[in-house]
Amino acid sequence: MRIPRRAESADRYTLATTYVAAGSFAAMLNSTDHQILYGRRGTGKTHALLYLRNLVENTRDVVLYIDLRTIGSAGGLYSDSSLSPTVRGTHLLVDTLETIHEELLTVAIEQETADQDGLLRHLDLLGQASTSVEVVGEVERETKVGGTVESARSLGLAASAHPGLNASATRRRSVTRESRLRRTGVERHHVMFGPVSRALRGIVESLGPARLWLLLDEWSSIPLDLQPMLADLLRRSVLPVAGITVKIGAIERRSRFYLPNPSGDYLGIEVGSDAASAVSLDDFLIFDHARTRAQEFFAELFYNHAGGRLKLMIHSPPQDAATLVEETFTHNAFPELVRAAEGVPRDAINIAALAAQLAHDEPIDLADIRRAARDWYLRDKHTAVNANEPARRMLAFLVDEVVGRRRSRTFLLDQLSDARRETVNQLYDARLLHVLRRGIVDRHNPGRVYDGFAIDYGCYVA
């Protein structure tokens, strides 16, 4: 039996029936507020957005799910450093608008809407507006001033031959002058999205009572320097339109939604103002102080993925999540799996799969979990951190100091400390460090606030 590791490889029915929401996350996700959905790799951002798409479609609203990794026709264009940000940014905006246009055109053809003719008419306007988008960035101007003056004078005197007189004089003057003026400076990025916004407003009106949901996944696949430009498109042309809800899936440390400029204005989206909220899946999946809740979450996760298939494979399948855990794991093995996963569903699935291979036809025991966690760390995480020398040294220091000397797996880091903060963030992105609690206040120094981290289980398990 094989459990899909990535949500996009599963069909819609599987996505709908296997989704498990942590705490109040589902209620927050279903709200019509604009939201940014943060989460590290493997926390279930794509699964959550695809699950939301299924729910929205069942309510007769219109939903567009766009994987930003797939937009555009020229591979590598956005990351091509030989092109200016102006060119790359303009291509990104046009490609995004064209993708939205194509998805809406599919809706107009395949679904019944309140005003079909109006929808098609405004789609034409959106198509026209998408080609007029322009981003202005760093510029270099060259001005040429030149001119040529030419004059000629001729004097001739002639008489008939036999006898004769012939005299001639010619004078020619040519003057050419050219000057060049080159100016180089940085102009504030700006976009002209008025026609886009008007077209989208007309599209929403044509949909009638149905709401338009725009789900943008894999935001962090866009180069960092271009992300504020796309965010600005959303802020100026999409977010102000009543009847549209935008949800964005992103990796927090690899995202840049906001770029201030010296004039006091900004490019992009201001989280908390333009977008109502940013929701972190990592925070919802922190179970350090609720072990029972963590075990219930992962038990339901495994049962939702495996239960339906087991009914087709064996005569007496487990009837609920608790029975599945009891029959598949020995007494202490499942709590150890939950601890090893550190709140990351994809890690839990991969560790369980490796442990099942080690156990063969027997229930998975504690030794299987520990060996599988170590193998998964070496296969998936160790290779990535080895390519980053500062991160590798930092991880080795933390394991030696925290695990080796202090006999712990957790430590505190001052939120205001810049020392080694970037390296710690890289380890966090790689799922080698995990946040257990944010905003821990020191009672003796109330002005100092800490984040509590845990070192990944695979780094130290023997």
Q: Model-derived features: where do they sit?
A:
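The catalytic "switch" region of P-loop NTPases
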Residues: 184-215, 219-330
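P-loop NTPase nucleotide-binding core
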Residues: 40-212, 254, 264-290
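Short, hydrophobic/amphipathic alpha-helical patches that form generic packing surfaces
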Residues: 90-102, 300-304, 425-432
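A short, basic N-terminal segment
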Residues: 1-35, 40, 57-60, 132, ...
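Long, acidic, intrinsically disordered low-complexity segments
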Residues: 23-56, 290-303
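A short acidic (Asp/Glu
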Residues: 48-49, 75-78, 223-229, 256-262, ...
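C-terminal leucine-rich, beta-strand-based interaction scaffolds used for sensing/assembly
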Residues: 328-329, 340-343, 357, 364-462
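Amphipathic alpha-helical "lid/sensor" segments that cap RecA-like P-loop NTPase cores
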Residues: 291-293, 297-382
